[in-house]
Amino acid sequence: MKTVYICSAYQTNYKVEKNKVKTFLYCRFAYDNGYFPIAPQVYLPYILDYYRADEKAKIFTHCKNAIAECDEFWVFGDIAELGCCKLVDYAIKQGKVIRYFDKYCELSE
């Protein structure tokens, strides 16, 4: 089974719980389509403090490490969030297959 990094908003507009639920739905979508989803943005903030600059940097590093190990990189929703943009750039540099989906899991062009 291929692995896929799920990139979706998490901290945007302080809607963490709503965004977490969306990320779980995106993970289910990936799983139902034959992929093993990786979404560290959902659990790393429970281990490290997102609001401390040094630990937020560690979260970003762990996310990049996860991207490096995944076969593909899927983006859901609006990537305007700064963290998502940086991760997309990193995935591009890693040569990952990148797919963009809207918030309803419809493939975008």
Where are these regions (language model features)?
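Catalytic phosphate/metal-binding cores of nucleic-acid and nucleotide-processing enzymes, i.e., regions
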Residues: 1-109
